[in-house]
Amino acid sequence: MGAGLLLLALLSSAEPGPTSVFDEDRVGIELGARASLGQTFWVLAAAGPSFGAEVRLRFGPHLGLGFALETGTGKSPDIDHPWTLRRKQIAFDLQWRFDTGPGIRPWVSLGMSFGTIDLEYDDLAFRASAHTVDFARLGLGVDFLVGRFLAIGPFVRGSLGHTHLAAADDPPEADTGRSLDSLDVGVRVLIGF
């Protein structure tokens, strides 16, 4: 009887372990999906949705290295010749999660991306494609831990990039190097292992 009471006292005084895999101090994997609405700034701004799937290697509760496949479209409000941009890219980033209390994990990330961008005018036969690179992508967000394996939350991401995408009114031999920046606001869902 005394040994049972002693064991019960020891177990009740032991600190509980992490309630979420995102808080565990070990290497883990996260699979995620995200959807956002944003602006792409090229010659003019183009607005539209983008989607992504990601795999993240988690080193403890704070540091993560992520890899993502992303696609998005944007329509221009240009009155003379409206156009659509379609972007496909591979991205990677380093992410740091902050421990602010039970169930809430703000985070910041910094990364790069590489891909292609396609331009199509709604009323012209002109089409163009080019490679694109985001030299810097800064992300800010909050993960709300739901249960042991799930995190969901909003994010904001801005990027500074470059492309040589030609527009319909560019001269044939012109240097078409231009900035290609973007700002996205969306939500992501992660499953942790």
Regions found by a protein language model. Give the residues of each.
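Sec-dependent signal peptide recognition
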Residues: M1-L8
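Short helix/strand-capping connector loops at secondary-structure junctions
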Residues: H164-E173
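Internal, hydrophobic beta-strand segments that form the core of beta-sheet-rich folds
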Residues: F155-G158
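Gram-negative (and chloroplast) outer-membrane scaffold detector with strong preference
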Residues: E54-G153, G186, L190-F193
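Short glycine/proline- and aromatic-enriched beta-strand/turn motifs that initiate or cap beta-hairpins
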Residues: A9-K75, L160, L180-F193
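Selective for proline/serine-rich intrinsically disordered segments
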Residues: A14-P16, A47, T100, I104, ...
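Outer-membrane beta-barrel domain signature
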Residues: S20-E24, Q39-L44, D78-T84, D99-G101, ...
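Amphipathic C-terminal alpha-helical segment
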Residues: R148, T163-H164
